[in-house]
């Protein structure tokens, strides 16, 4: 089957449909008469996507995203795909890549935030009253450039969802599709009666790593020949693969919404008490109590629960959302913190002077008036862990790039895309909100998925006030808090102790039956 035929099978008139979806959502956010910076970015992306012939590949993800959001959960797209404004408007990314700005949901008044600090994001700024209607304007925008990060032909998407079955059902219903179960993959055949309806058990669904929209012509029979090499399918013109992972965070946040009645869309990005949790755990307690740990309050907070993240967080002391994004990147990259950024911070460099994201490398050079093409090539060289060339070093010296920054570039092995860090920082923020404001619901929901081991039951039965010494004896906590001998078991024991010290009833089994 020719790609254009397959594109029509997935979505007829995909260019037109994707454009309508994006323009409608942009109009809802920014008014029908789009501000110039919004219109310019959207048009540039849509033209690029249409020219690449991949508009139809956005539609299945849009279908999945709508279904996931209808359940009260969210979808997270991995990698640089999340940087596209089109992805944001389709709902398959929660990251608005535009420059920092305010927009009013009531009258659609929009203001660009005048900042020359390329690392700042909209969430760093306080709420502002709309000069037109007097309503509250919301800050937004993560300042992610477009062209280097949007790839033309994408045979595969990687997403995190609360449940793989939701993805399968959404596509099955929309396309009136049959399904064939393969080895860790479900093949969905649009408009086909050649296969039975999907009825695999939950264990099979959890083990999935791919869902494939496949042309019935490709199959050509009532049962799929699994001898097809994965690479052959991926390079085919008539297959779309969706790599899926069942995300524990999405499941946990869905559970917390059910328990508290507060959804993630109701959580403010301007809560100073939440940012304080990433500096100290004192705010978790109602009295003047000084906690046992002397550490930050991020036990149980994804991406910030382990000692390496603590070490970075304590070194940089985050006080705004962009700081959290950088911490995630420093923790996730290779060769960006130890023997690199950590040393520079100790020497007095600012968090946002050091390398954390690949986009920041390019934006830093652009701020130094380096040509766009040169800035892009240097960024590509650094992010792939390659040392800068002599020509690049001469160019950087000529542009006034300090030697310490050039040396830092050459120490990098792998640096993260900003979209990944933003997505993780947002999840951490949401979880921190629930932990601070709904402690019982947070600890209950968290441990609901962790309490299978008998040690938790033993902890609950034998807990008594001020048992921190017992914990140290159990898992050598003194060494653990020196960042040695740390694992998830130790973390969960500390979390249980924290819950008890905050007055939370540890009898989780009576809270959740079945």
Per-range role (PLM):
Residues 1-514:
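Noncatalytic, beta-rich nucleic-acid-contacting surfaces in large DNA/RNA-processing enzymes
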